[in-house]
Amino acid sequence: GYFSKSLKSTKSAADFTSTKLYINLENILKDSDTLFLTVPDGSISQIWDYMRNLDIRNKNICHCSGSISSTAFFDAQNKGAYAYSIHPLCAINDRYEAYKNLANAVFTIEGNSEHLDSLMQIFQKCGNDIIKIDTQKKALYHASAVMASNLVTALFATSIDLLNRCGVDKKMAKNILLPLLQGNVANLATFDIKDALTGPVERND
């Protein structure tokens, strides 16, 4: 099932996933053994402050933040619940299309040991690899993902700007540089990091 603060959003998501629509948190909690808070990072603690006062005994409470650990649900165990963070290493930019990439995504998980293995098995049965990470190293993990994803995009945008300053139209600059980027990604997929290097870095110019 699905619940959101907006009825429109709730209906849209429930229709899209062919699941039940819920109009309050209490009812979806009652009907579920596992809940995923798929919300912005800044909203996790706010929702938890409300949720922790409800009957969450024997519930798996999960969020999908890359940077925040399961300790966001700071007293879940005292409330009889089990806290987890489960994060897909996948670029998601469209709620109605990006889910298609999840089939090939690797997930990471950390949290209470009680149901951790059974949660991992759910993803494994879907064909996904899922890796346990150290709760204390969640920020380090997130920094790795950001550098491989967001920073690459930012560097590519800078490359376009530099070529534009050379008099090349931005659209053309993107088209010119994309094969270069794609070639490097292909090299990374095929060779060790050192052997994937090309150009002045590889030549030590």
Regions found by a protein language model. Name each.
Residues 66, 71, 87-90, 100, ...:
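Flexible, active-site-adjacent loop/turn segments at secondary-structure boundaries
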Residues 182-205:
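Interdomain hinge/lid region at the active-site interface
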Residues 16-97:
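Rossmann-like NAD(P)(H) cofactor-binding subdomain of soluble oxidoreductases
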Residues 3-7:
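N-terminal Rossmann-fold cofactor-binding loop
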